[in-house]
Amino acid sequence: MSNLSLFDDVSAEIAQLREQIRYHNYRYYALDEPQIPDAEYDRLMQRLRELEAQYPASVTPDSPTQRVGAAPLSAFQTVEHQIPMLSLDNAFEEADVIAFNQRILDRLKSTENIEYACELKLDGLAVSLLYRDGVLVRGATRGDGSKGEDITQNLRTIASVPLKLLGEGYPAVLEVRGEVYMPKAGFNALNEKARSTGEKLFVNPRNAAAGALRQLDSRITASRPLEMCAYSVGLVEGGELPGTHTGILAALKSWGFLTNKETATASTIADCIAFYQSIQARRDSLAYDIDGIVFKVNARELQESLGFISRAPRWAIAYKFPAQEEMTVLQDVEFQVGRTGAVTPVARLQPVFVGGVTVSNATLHNRDEIQRLGIMIGDTVIVRRAGDVIPQIVQVVESRRPTDARPVLFPDHCPVCGSPVETLEDEAIARCSGGLVCAAQRKEAIKHFASRKALDVEGLGDKLVEQLVDTGLVSKLADIYQLTGEQLAAMERMGEKSADNLLQALEASKHTTLAKFIYALGIREIGEATARNLANHFGSLEKLAEADEETLVQVNDVGPVGAHFVAEFFAQESNRQAVADLRAAGIHWQDLDVSTIEDLPLKGLTYVLTGTLEVMSRDDAKAHLLALGAKVAGSVSAKTDYVVAGPGAGSKLQKARELNLNVMDEEALLDLLRKHGRLE
């Protein structure tokens, strides 16, 4: 037999082994119906390893043998989610779920029952898996929803993550979203092993899963008992998906993904609540941790009609399980001062294990909450992890109150700077009146200014900000741009290299956008989306600073409260000086050429971008359209006016044609932008 014939035979055997192993992985992980014993599976895998060792050129990234982990990385790379990974609104009571259903009916102008998909909310970490032509090319964390970290090597080690999709009919580009978690049995075994070797135990399965996913050495991840359960899709191009959420889950299962077997449909909101109650009753007997049930409108057409708010879809809600509660003793109450001067009482507790973690602090919110609880230092209290995340005191056990219990005295003066504490007539929150004179407010203002969604100064972390303010090197925002390498290198846990990297990050942050700068200023009630609306409306900081409240409320998403705080911010000379100092330090952006909102040429028009744009990025195209007054939506509906379709446009383009909508290519978009002065 010739060498060529031998190689052909080996290649055929390797291909057959890979297909067999993928098939049996699918039977085992997705269907939970193995067809062969573990020993036979091990023999198939061993034979494949032997052949690949003899013929290294035959090894491909999607081979089942490549799950073992690769060489350690020095750091994770940042990746941008083309379609944001939004969070979900939460419901904590049955009334919240009923209200959610009513909002949907009202928005759809319908009295008919809505069909919902009911899914278990796995307690793990959300991830994104990107497939091109059926092959896994990238895996990422959710991150802040817009940007995450590239953890492809780690995700490849998880057996329930398909490296190559099964079957046919999947889109050319498919982004699958799911939850990586650690089953209880695997978690217990992991901790038992750690206990036997004297290592530190993991607190709960979620923390163990998070630690495993964020290992720079994927071989460590490969040794951890992780699973990935698919629950939705993101980017889809070059193919069609079923018209319901449950249909999509069925398709994902057929392509090799693990989906949750408990998922069901409910024809009424009462059925949703009954499903929640049935799962809650056997929550502890499940093989994995869950922290609630997610209800999603099942029909994709209705999902698209309902749309999104800036942080979450309108068509889904997470009904959280009641938090676990424990009793402990309130040892003291301290008062913290936040970025906007809010003085918040923080309970210092005798440490107690509740909801899977050891809790020693809890929020008391404000003076009204202290009075409502009737709490005293020394009391025995019931602590709950609200939403299984934020510990809070929900009740005082007065029968256990000691004779030496002391009242909680709310301060009249700021515990940090000594300025008077004020409470507005219509607010429950007490605030330090010191403004940026207060070191605590300065610290929080700088942290916000440097945060990822603001000016994104990488390396300027919370602890370093604390040091810089405490040592007097930074007394106002602009001071961070006057820091020297020598000053930074002298800080704790800093060296010359870290100092140089931070100086470069500070320099890079000087080139920003008007929207990010407005957000970075930390004006009360002005979040990321509202800052963008203000930038698009006024075009320049000067025009924004001159606007009165009556003008400001005309801006989309700006109400009377937000308008008041914006006007108040720019009316204060100290804030105007802070802005001037920042601009003098070199912070700059390109002003937007906009006039009044009535004159914006695309006002009232809705655009959808799909496919790949070649001359500019989709983000740039979106920014130009927004600046001209258009609304840019993420999905096609009958309300869409124009669809901009680049190469690779898929289901959105097809739907646009079905609805007989106006479709334009990138060149037509560029002509439109030139016509209105956005491009030369």
From Swiss-Prot:
Residues 597-680 form the BRCT domain. Its EC number is 6.5.1.2. Pfam families: BRCT, DNA_ligase_aden, DNA_ligase_OB, DNA_ligase_ZBD, HHH_2, HHH_5, Nlig-Ia. SUPFAM superfamilies: BRCT domain (SSF52113), DNA ligase/mRNA capping enzyme, catalytic domain (SSF56091), Nucleic acid-binding proteins (SSF50249), RuvA domain 2-like (SSF47781). GO terms for molecular function: DNA binding; DNA ligase (NAD+) activity; metal ion binding. NCBIfam families: dnlj (TIGR00575), PRK07956.1 (NF005932). This is DNA ligase. The active site is at 121 (n6-amp-lysine intermediate). Keywords: DNA damage, DNA repair, DNA replication, Ligase, Magnesium, Manganese, Metal-binding, NAD, Zinc. One of its GO terms (biological process) is DNA repair. NAD(+) binds at residues 38-42, 87-88, 119, 142, 179, 296, 320. Signal peptide: none annotated.
